[in-house]
Structures are given as C-alpha cells and as structure tokens.
Amino acid sequence: MELLSLENASRHYGKKSQITALDDFSVRIEEGEMLALMGKSGSGKSTVLNIISGIDESDSGTYCFGGEDISRKKGDAMTMFRRKNIGIVMQHFALVDDMDCFENIALPLRLARVNKKEISRRVNEVAQKLDITSKLKKLPKELSGGEAQRVAIARAIISEPKLILADEPTGALDEENSARIMDIFKQLNESGITLLIVTHDPGVAAKCKRTIWIKDGRNAGMEE
C-alpha cells in the first residue's frame, strides 16, 4: 500500500527563481518500506525532505500522504499533520542544549499537550527500547555522538509517526555507531515504521530496500 507520493515537484529559490533545487522530481514510498535517497551535496536531497515534512513547499507538483492531498495544507494544519505523522532525525542531532534528555524526548508530547503520566510512561518505554534509560537526566553535551543520535531517534518516534525522515543520520558517527543506528532503523522498520533515509554512504543505502538517486534536483535512477 502506498504511503506517500511526491509527483513532478519543482522548487526554485531567489528573487527571480534563478536557483533550481528540484526540477520535476517524483518519488513514491510504500507503507513499511525503508528507502534511501542518494545524491551529491546540493543535489536537492534536503529539499525533498523539507517538502515531505511540510517545512517547505514545492512551487509545482502534487504531494499525497495516506491518500490525502497534502499540497493544500498550510500553517497550523500542516504543523498538525507533521506532528501526527512524521518524525525527523538530523545529522547533528538537533537536541535542545539546556534540556536534559528526558525533556528532549518528551518535547513532541508536551507540544501535543499529552498528560504528564503518559509522557513519563512513553519516554521511559522508548528509552528502554533504545538503551538510553541511564542518559535521561543528562544534558546533550554529556553524551557521545552515538548516544545523542539515539536520543534524537527516541524523540522522533515518541509520537508514533508513520514515517521517519532521516537526513544523513550516520554522517557524524564512527563506523561502530553508524552500524548501531542502522540496526535501530532496521528494527523500527520491522515494527512497521516507514523510513526515508538521505545518505551519501553506499553502505547505508545497501541496507535499504530501494535507493532513489537525485542529481541537480531531478530523478537520476533507482536501484533495488
């Protein structure tokens, strides 16, 4: 079953739209799939993630998620859609420096006004799953790179999203921690979560079901 489709999307920047980030780009992702998006720096990978997450919008094309036309959503409606359906994992973790790990993980639930008892239950549950229970009272600066990324993943999945968008999630990690993060993604995928992983690492892409290539904002091939 198809979870999302981005069809013929284009995105231009600059006063006269002279910078092309996406040019008639399309991607379809099946529910329960783990897909890699590969391309060089500046090829448009992050723009694809920003459009799918609703952080940005395309100038043309259509975007459907779960059979619903998301292209029409704006403002608060798009924010609510993102909070309900999508978790985001960044290369450099994007944790709040002055919040301990418990509060970083709990942040999406607090924004959704979930009660304190349920927040505590869910944070401790996901922390146990990712082996970071002992880190919950630590600040991000006290963590290793691998630990920080596991906290970021915990925050991304705490709202039980249908889709995880991961932007170079192993790019700042050593080989051992990269392998551990990919094992976590595999487990999440096996539990039913769909993942789209932006990467430049062929080893990461090899662990995904499919790889979509992007070059100069355009589709440049697919590997299975």
Briefly describe each language-model feature range.
Residues 3-4, 9-214:
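ABC family nucleotide-binding domain
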Residues 211-224:
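H-loop (His-switch) and adjacent beta-strand-loop-beta switch element
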